[in-house]
Amino acid sequence: MNKKKIILLFILTLIGILCVFLNGKEEPEIGVGQNKVSFSNKTNSFYYDQLDETEKRVCNDITALVEQGNGGKIDLTSPISTYRYLRIVRTLSFDPEYQNWAISLIFPVGENNKLIDRNTINDDCNIMKLYVLVNDSKKRKELKNFKLVLNDENIITNIDEFEKICKSADFSTEYYQEKSKEIDACYDEIIKEMPKNMNEKEAVQYFLNWIKDNMEYDYSVYESSIEPYYDKLYENEVYADASNKGCILDKRGICGGISIILSELCNRVGITAYPVFGTIKSDGTLIPHGWVAMRVDDSTYYIDPTYVCQTGEM
């Protein structure tokens, strides 16, 4: 190759690099636009379907308790491990069908009212009962003045008072049903306003635009400390507001709630989606984070709607 051709090739390469630089990097596409949305208003039970029969029974017992209008104690027919406990809690927190906005915290308690360390994940079946605290905004002031009292062996010494706190929420079946309908109405309204004949790719873009224009990332919740959770009942209820599908009412949420909103909208138009959770690095520290896994045009994509909400960019 002669000198002129080498110089010409160099110039063309440089021009190409400059074009890429000036135009910015190419945005990854979500789907190809081949499948139409179905507006089926169906959901999926991705997390629930992976539970074994014992875990499903406990999950259903918790749901039934809350739907009756209160929290309280559930005595387990057979002890479960923290591994099983975590699977149940994750289902009630993130499953598109079984996610329950009304649950704030579920306390694992063992023999002699010992609070089991939920962060030690193992197969030891030492959880004998669960205490369910519902998300009751009307009675949160009481939680500011209540503390679980633990002795040196992690035994809850004020268990009767704690059970009363769980059972005495200003909650009712009617309130649960009314707020559930109010939450559903928000999602229905968004879908009702969608242009007709959208394909899956366009629908996802539409939902992300809605999140960008309407949702606000709640930094105040993210920056507040919620650990140790048994000592921060009030803070955990506020945290729950921003991390379940009900956060659509106040248009404020954090990664969990925003991811649930996107997956909920997608499922209602026939796009299979569910929240997934892991960790990301922030200033060198690993922190929890949520995304959405979805099937668009027969391929799986992982979308971070929180990034859209925080930056206003896709």
What are these regions (language model features)?
Residues N244-I258:
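A short, highly charged nucleic-acid-interacting micro-segment common to nuclease
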Residues G256-M314:
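Hydrophobic/aromatic-rich core segments of domains that either
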Residues M1-L12:
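N-terminal Sec-pathway targeting helices
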Residues L14-N23:
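Hydrophobic alpha-helical membrane-insertion segments, chiefly the h-region
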Residues F39-N44, V66-G71, E163-T173, K181-E193:
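Acidic/histidine-rich, surface-exposed loop or edge segments in extracytoplasmic proteins
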Residues F171-C247:
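Secondary-structure boundary elements
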Residues G24-E163:
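Intrinsically disordered, low-complexity N-terminal segments that are enriched in acidic
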